[in-house]
Amino acid sequence: EEVTEHVNYTGKRFPFFVSVTPEEDHIVFNGFNNYSFSTVFLDANLDFSGVYSGAAFDGGMSAILPLGADKFSLARFSFSDVYMNAGATLSPTAVDIAEGIPSEWKSELDAESPILIKNITINSTEYAAFLATTKSNQLTLMLYQAGSEELAGSKYLGDSVPLKACDFSITEDGGLMILTQATVMSSFNRIATIKLSKEELESLVQ
């Protein structure tokens, strides 16, 4: 029933994803395993390697970015709460629960909205960039140096029009283009973009 509601946009939206480790020795995907929303690791032969199981339909990973050497930047949810760890250590051969991964509670974030994590480079330094939606319908961009759990910089976006995070990418001129869903006049959902210049990005991590 939950999967049908996800497909038909009539219920909870689950953060399905597929990724691969930098060493290309494991595939990581979010899906259902033993009736729980789980993060599953497959080895290079596509055989089961390990799993971090969620709490049925109410907990699990929201997003994950493999950094290499068993390090991951991740966000996870538990009911209406969101937790983040930009430098978590996960074993691809573990059989464990997602809620047991040490993470920082982010009380302001909306667990029902997408969370995106990508590698970006600013001034030749790599960062794990988290883009999420707050419960007050703003966007928040958080930057961590690759593998570090210490916040390097952050920025809130949107204070008059409700926004929801959709995607983001570095532009050719070194800026950041953010794709978002904007709710106009409290009723109409529209696609919108927000551009941060190269200089604005650099100022976040100075």
What function would you assign to each model-found segment?
Residues 2-9, 48-55, 97-109, 150-158:
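A short beta-strand motif characteristic of beta-propeller blades
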Residues 6-20, 56-69, 109-121, 162-170:
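Repeated scaffold domains used in trafficking and secretory/extracellular systems
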